[in-house]
Amino acid sequence: MDRINFETLNIEYYENVNLSDYCTWKSGCNVPYIFYPKNINELKTLLNLKCKKYIIGNGSNTLFISLKNTIVISTKKMKSIIFEGEILKVECGASLSLVMSKCLNNGLTGFEFSTGIPGTIGGALITNAGANGGTISDNLISVSILD
């Protein structure tokens, strides 16, 4: 990995991390750095770095193998949920259980299918997660992505 002064980024990170605590399977390898961006701008900064990157959310159903010379970016702190009437804008790191709870507290239904799914919105979108007769795509209007 090229020399990058990560301290100048002002983004929370940790060095020499074993990923077994970051996935539901408790399997892991050691990585030189794990970063926790709090917003889209911090995520963009990390994605623009000239090094190998691996992005994780909750680590649900993830098996980590060798990630030598790779930085890990955890989206766990990107969990903003904004209500605009009956429309939600949700960041990728928000857990499905948090989104469901917020929906129910605001009188919105349709997301109950996610009960018991341990993942995040980001992971649910990638896999079209579903259970109990419903999927994430059933209530989806649009997705914004970073290219």
Residue ranges and their predicted role:
Residues 1-56:
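N-terminal, positively charged, Ser/Thr/Ala/Gly-biased leader segments
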Residues 9, 86, 139:
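Residue-level signal for beta-strand positions within conserved beta-sheet cores that form or flank
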Residues 24, 64-65, 120-122:
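Short secondary-structure boundary/hinge segments and terminal tails
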Residues 28, 34-40, 63-80, 126-147:
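Structural signature of FAD isoalloxazine-binding scaffolds in flavoprotein oxidoreductases
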Residues 53, 62-63:
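Acidic/His- and Gly-rich active-site-bordering loop/insert found
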Residues 40-45, 49-54, 77-124, 146:
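FAD-binding glycine-rich core of flavoenzymes that anchor FAD
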Residues 11-19, 23, 56, 73, ...:
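Short, functionally important structural connectors and interaction interfaces within domains
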